[in-house]
Regions:
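Peripheral interaction segments used for macromolecular assembly
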Residues: 1-198
Length: 198
């Protein structure tokens, strides 16, 4: 997996993106929030709002399966019919996830060391969205080298324990302070976990 930096983005960067149909090129909604399944470490879809400054929440949601392409400037879908009413599975996930938002969750290593709190989720937008890391802050251990927030790569499977997200202690050697170098850090970290190589 060779990750080009332009394929990585923070989940919060998607908020406000227009949802555009390929059918007519019409912007039919805006992303209100990103629905992230912390247990699966995956992007499930989006809640939506009407376009414009005063656009309120929409009753429909957009499941990831309906997204044709996700870019830095828009979310592309085939047609307006791809939006689902809130009584479907994604809507249920949205409802259930309100009490377990990953933002502000504590990140611990499997050795019991506190790394900080999640401030954002990093998504690889290649063939399909994959959550590959967290941006964290509030770390006395990691942030002195960057003065603020750092990027922590995630393993291919993630342990979630109540309020905390658990990552392998080996993550220390793969933390970066810039998004541009983060893709390579994710690759090296996952390779290290698979093979034990440094």
């Amino acid at each position: 997996m060779s990750v080009h930096p332009s394929l990585l983005l923070r989940a919060t960067e998607l908020i406000g993106h227009p949802v555009v149909t390929l059918e007519g090129g019409e912007a039919i909604a805006e992303v209100k929030d990103v629905v992230y399944g912390s247990a699966e470490a995956s992007l499930l879809g989006f809640t939506l709002r009407h376009r414009g400054f005063l656009g309120g929440p929409m009753k429909q949601v957009l499941a990831w399966a309906q997204v044709v392409a996700l870019g830095r400037h828009a979310v592309m879908i085939a047609s307006a019919g791809d939006l689902a009413e809130r009584d479907d599975v994604l809507a249920q996930e949205v409802k259930e996830s309100r009490g377990r938002n990953v933002i502000d969750s504590e990140v611990l290593t499997d050795a019991g060391e506190r790394l900080g709190e999640v401030t954002d989720v990093v998504i690889l937008i290649d063939d399909g969205p994959e959550v590959v890391g967290y941006e964290i802050g509030g770390s006395e251990v990691l942030t002195p080298r960057s003065g603020g927030h750092v990027f922590v790569p995630l393993p291919e499977t993630l342990a979630v324990s109540g309020e905390a997200l658990i990552v392998p202690a080996a993550v220390h050697d793969f933390v970066t302070d810039d998004l541009a170098g983060f893709g390579a850090a994710v690759e090296r970290f996952r390779d290290h976990l698979r093979t034990g190589s440094p």
